[in-house]
């Protein structure tokens, strides 16, 4: 199984920053009886590995070689690869930069490296043979990509990208699909003149053309670390929850707009 990690963005919400935002220290881990800072993107890699990934591809931009230097060619039980997005051109463009590595018979998971979410085994709840989204309930869905479901509470009918009135509190935090579907989506994106910056609008076109997607309500807590507010929230949530721990966060900051915990 492949994991794709789009990490080519400039991190404008955190500028000026002397290193890639995917390497922001959030929490810590113990290595050889010594605690060391943990880069925020390590949490996504660990979740991908727990979900079955044995190969992970970072999509990086020019000037972000520090990610390669930090991780090298291996992390946990997964081999790492790197491809380059020459200029920031949206999530769709970034993800499809890695498509040549993914065979139609592979399974692929995609997540955002500046987020932390629980449970850390959430990707295992998604099927391997269908396009499916790991959903999280949040208080401010207008800040994210809200996912509308059919009456069966399973099939996706629409993704509402950062709408002021999304009509649901459920957003996607990661998604998974067969490699064949990734290639179908790329073909559709090309047919649409590559105009889709966000995956949500492309998925809506895919659904309109007869495609199928599932939304799995298995997420419990979600933090966007890409803002200072979210960064503080993640530090609070992870202060007693190191990477690799199965424990759920027990506290949440009332100040944090981007931390969401469901009990």
Where are the regions a protein language model picked out?
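Structural beta-sheet core signal
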Residues: 3-5, 58, 110, 133-134, ...
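N-terminal glycine-rich phosphate-binding loop and ensuing alpha1 helix
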Residues: 1-68, 78-80, 85
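Well-ordered alpha-helical segments embedded in enzymatic catalytic cores
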Residues: 40-44, 94-97, 201-202
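Short beta->alpha linker loops
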Residues: 62-63, 86, 198, 220
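Short coil/turn segments at beta-strand junctions that form active-site/ligand-binding loops
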Residues: 1, 54, 105-107, 130, ...
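Conserved beta-loop-beta/alpha segment of the NTase-like Rossmann-fold superfamily
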Residues: 67-151, 186
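A structural signal for short hydrophobic beta-strand segments in well-ordered beta-sheet cores
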Residues: 23, 147-151, 215
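Catalytic-core segments of class I nucleotidyltransferases/pyrophosphorylases
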Residues: 124, 155-223, 228-251, 258
């Amino acid at each position: 199984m492949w994991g794709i990690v789009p990490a080519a963005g400039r991190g404008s919400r955190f500028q000026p920053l002397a290193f890639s935002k995917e390497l922001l220290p959030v929490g810590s881990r113990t290595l050889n009886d010594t605690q060391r800072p943990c880069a925020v993107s390590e949490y996504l890699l660990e979740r991908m590995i727990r979900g079955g990934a044995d190969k992970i591809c970072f999509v990086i931009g020019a000037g972000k070689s520090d990610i390669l230097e930090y991780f090298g060619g291996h992390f946990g039980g997964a081999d790492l690869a790197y491809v380059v997005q020459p200029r920031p051109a949206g999530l769709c463009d970034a993800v499809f930069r890695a498509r040549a590595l993914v065979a139609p018979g592979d399974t692929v998971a995609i997540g955002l490296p500046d987020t932390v979410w629980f449970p850390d085994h959430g990707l295992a709840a998604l099927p391997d043979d269908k396009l499916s989204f790991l959903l999280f309930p949040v208080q401010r869905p207008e800040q994210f990509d809200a996912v509308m479901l059919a009456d069966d509470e399973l099939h996706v009918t629409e993704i509402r990208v950062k709408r002021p009135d999304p009509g649901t509190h459920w957003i996607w935090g990661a998604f998974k699909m067969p490699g064949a579907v990734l290639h179908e989506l790329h073909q559709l994106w090309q047919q649409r003149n590559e105009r889709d910056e966000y995956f949500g609008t492309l998925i809506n076109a895919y659904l309109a053309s007869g495609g199928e997607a599932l939304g799995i309500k298995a997420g419990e807590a979600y933090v966007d670390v890409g803002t200072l507010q979210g960064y503080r929230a993640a530090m609070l949530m992870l202060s007693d929850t190191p990477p690799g721990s199965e424990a759920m966060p027990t506290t949440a900051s009332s100040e944090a707009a981007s931390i969401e915990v469901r009990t």
